[in-house]
Swiss-Prot record:
It is found in: Cytoplasm. Zn(2+) 1 binds at H81, D144, D201. The active site is at D83, E178. One of its GO terms (biological process) is proteolysis. One of its GO terms (cellular component) is cytosol. Its EC number is 3.4.11.4. This is Peptidase T. SUPFAM superfamilies: Bacterial exopeptidase dimerisation domain (SSF55031), Zn-dependent exopeptidases (SSF53187). Zn(2+) 2 binds at D144, E179, H383. The keyword Cytoplasm applies. The gene is pepT. It holds the Pfam family Peptidase_M20. It comes from Bacillus cereus (strain ZK / E33L). Belongs to the peptidase M20B family.
Amino acid sequence: MNLKQELIERFTRYVKIDTQSNEDSHTVPTTPGQIEFGKLLVEELKEIGLTEVTMDDNGYVMATLPANTDKDVPVIGFLAHLDTATDFTGKNVKPQIHENFDGNAITLNEELNVVLTPEQFPELPSYKGHTIITTDGTTLLGADDKAGLTEIMVAMNYLIHNPQIKHGKIRVAFTPDEEIGRGPAHFDVEAFGASFAYTMDGGPLGGLEYESFNAAGAKLTFNGTNTHPGTAKNKMRNATKLAMEFNSYLPVEEAPEYTEGYEGFYHLLSLNGDVEQSKAYYIIRDFDRENFEVRKHNVENIVKQMQEKYGQDAVVLEMNDQYYNMLEKIEPVREIVDIAYEAMKSLNIEPNIHPIRGGTDGSQLSYMGLPTPNIFTGGENYHGKFEYVSVDVMEKAVQVIIEIARRFEEQA
C-alpha cells in the first residue's frame, strides 16, 4: 500500500466515527465517541510498532517512536485532536472520494441541492488533478482534525518501515475536546517528555502557523417574563428580544464574516430560547492582548447597561479565557519554526506563514512549557457540509513530518 492509499484507507475509516465534542458536558472527554476512537488508535499504534502506547483516564493517547540514531537529538512531538467541531452534525459521515478532480462544481447531494462550487469557494479549481474527499452534503467531514491525525499515523508507519531515515525519539499524542478549547486541560507535558512539538491541525498546503488568537467564550442567559400576549402591556419581558438587543450593541463589522488577517471579532455561535429564557454563546477573539481585554470589557459593559435598564436578573454573564497568543512562547525557540520552514522548502512547498484565525492545542501547550507551532493538513472549509480535503496535500504533510524528524537528527 502506497502513502496515498494508506491515507485514504485510514482517513475514510476514521471520519466515520462520531467524535464531536460537547460544550455542555462536564466529563473528560466530553463524548464517548472520543474514547472509542482513542481505543482504536491505541491498537493501531501498537500494530504499527510504536512503543509506550498509553491512553489515560481522560482519553489522551500517547506513543513513542524510539530513536534509531546514536546522536543526542531533542525529543520532538507531533499532535492532533480526536474530536470534531460542534458547528454542524458529525454523525453518519459518508466520505465521497473524487479521483483526478476536474476542478469544476461537485454536486454533493442532489436531493438537497448541495453543490460545492468555484463561485462560492474560489480555491476549488486549484485542486484540479488531485484526489479530494468531500462530504455527502449532510454532515461535516471531520478533516479537522482527522486529516492531521491520519498524517501522523502514516508518517510513523513510514519511518518504521524505512529505518535508513535517521531520527531521534519522537512522541505522538492525540488529544480530546480541542474544538471546545479544553484540549490541553489534562495534558501531561512532563509525561509527554518532548522539548517541543508540532500540531498537525492547519489548512491548505504550506500553512505554517505560530501566532494564534487570544480567545474567550461568553455564555449569556437572558431572563424574561412571559404573560398572555393579549394582556402583556407593561408586564411581558421577552428574553429573545433581550438577546437581540445585546447583539445590536456589538459592532456589526467586527464579526467573522467581515474580518481577516490580524483583525479580531465577536462571534455569536448559538442562540436559542423563547419569551421566558434565551441563551446565547459568543466567542471573542483578538491577536493583540490589549484589544482582547478591551473586547471582554465591552461585553461586560453592555451586560451592566442592560442590567441597569431591565434589572440585575435580566442578563447573566459567564465569561472565561480559553487560550492566548502562542507567539510569545515560540519566539525564544524560533529554530523549531525554521526547521519546519526549511523542511517545506526542501520538498518544493512554499511556506505560507500567517496567523491562526482559530486555536490549536498548541496555543495552550506553548504556555504549559511545550512550544508547539502548527502545520498544514490539506483541509478546506472546516466545520461544515462543504468541508473537503486533498489527499495529495495530505501526502505532502506526511513528507513534511518525515523531513522535520530527519532534519532534527541531521542538525544534532
